């Protein structure tokens, strides 16, 4: 089941997106959680070289200070190319299990895109 209720605005931190998931509708017993997956749909881009490679990284936000600075930990990463189209899948089971046990710790995910550098 999906428990995404809303997508709040964007916080700037490099070139990324900060997204929150309302998980209060999910069962609070994390021991019954088998797996949790975040899926992002990628459309091909025509503004860059189609063969360009990128890594999409999902970070769990641990804290946000008064100036918008974030302490984060990497949860999952997927490599893709600029010409790829389809769903990128990220295993976020550990983060969701933690949030189910301590909902106040749910500060969302921060998603970043990193180009691969050519030698």
Where are the language model's segments positioned?
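Beta-strand elements of modular eukaryotic interaction domains
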Residues: 8-11, 27-31, 44-49, 77-80, ...
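Generic detector of short, locally flexible boundary/turn motifs and exposed helical patches
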Residues: 2-4, 21, 53-57, 72-77
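Cysteine-clustered segments with highest specificity for TGF-beta superfamily mature ligands
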Residues: 17, 40, 64-119
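Short coil-to-beta strand junction motifs in C2/discoidin
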Residues: 33-34, 48-59
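Generic hydrophobic, helix-prone segments enriched in Leu/Val/Ile
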Residues: 1, 58, 96-99
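A short beta-strand-loop element at or near the start of a globular domain
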Residues: 1-42
């Amino acid at each position: 089941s999906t428990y995404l209720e809303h997508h709040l605005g964007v916080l700037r931190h490099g070139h990324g997106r900060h997204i929150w998931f309302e998980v209060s509708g999910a069962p609070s017993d994390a021991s019954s959680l088998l797996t949790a997956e975040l899926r992002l749909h990628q459309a091909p881009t025509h503004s860059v070289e189609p063969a360009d490679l990128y890594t999409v990284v999902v970070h769990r936000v641990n804290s946000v200070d008064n100036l918008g600075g974030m302490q984060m930990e990497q949860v999952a990463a997927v490599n893709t190319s600029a010409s790829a189209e389809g769903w990128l899948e990220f295993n976020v089971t550990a983060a969701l299990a933690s949030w189910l046990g301590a909902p106040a710790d749910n500060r969302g995910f921060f998603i970043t895109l990193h180009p691969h550098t050519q030698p």
